[in-house]
Design a protein with these regions (language model features):
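Anion-binding and metal-coordination hotspots
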Residues: 1-183
């Protein structure tokens, strides 16, 4: 049994759509079963609340053994959570990275390798004239499409598990993990 983080970006399209969909969210600690829409949440009133939804998924996985690799279907529970507080935290961190990227562009520093959390991931370099001819100098700028693409995942956090624990127990464990990551 395990609980492991699940990047939403790496899920199949229909699962990403389900994870990011606006409706069918439950409120942690609310026993009524009332469903919420994320678009109807209040940034102040619902700031400290923790919303979630869950479903079973089947994923094909490659199991590596001494006798070679083999494919196996793994059935596991996908739990996605959403928190306005976590969304705001992620936006705050990104804003600092964007400000560093702006300074890099302004300094004329060369844009080398871009890592996952490197501010340089927001920088795009263009080395052509308006006519499409190769230019002698490259122009770097902040690519807002990268920012927009990341922003759609703000506030969401997903885990997969095979634990037999209750949803509430798994969500509490997940919440503690996320709080540790914010430190």
């Amino acid at each position: 049994s395990y609980i492991t983080t699940q990047p939403i970006k790496t899920l199949k399209g229909f699962l990403q759509d389900w994870c990011l969909s606006d409706d069918e969210w439950l409120l942690d600690g609310d026993k009524s079963g009332k469903k919420y829409k994320l678009s109807e949440l209040d940034s102040e009133h619902d700031r400290d609340k923790y919303f979630y939804k869950t479903r079973w998924i089947k994923e094909e996985s490659i199991i590596r053994t001494d006798k070679g690799d083999r494919k196996k279907i793994i059935e596991q529970k996908l739990i996605v959570s959403y928190s306005i507080k976590y969304r705001d935290y992620q936006r705050h961190v990104r804003q600092g990275q964007i400000e560093r990227a702006i300074k890099i562009v302004a300094s004329g520093e060369p844009i080398n390798k871009k890592k996952v959390n490197d501010p340089k991931r927001f920088i795009k370099t263009y080395q052509a004239t308006n006519d499409g001819e190769l230019a002698s100098q490259a122009v770097s700028y902040i690519d807002t499409s990268v920012i927009d693409a990341e922003e759609k995942y703000d506030g969401f956090y997903a885990v997969c598990t095979k634990l037999d624990d209750s949803k509430e127990s798994i969500i509490r464990k997940n919440k503690r993990r996320r709080e540790i990551e914010e430190c």
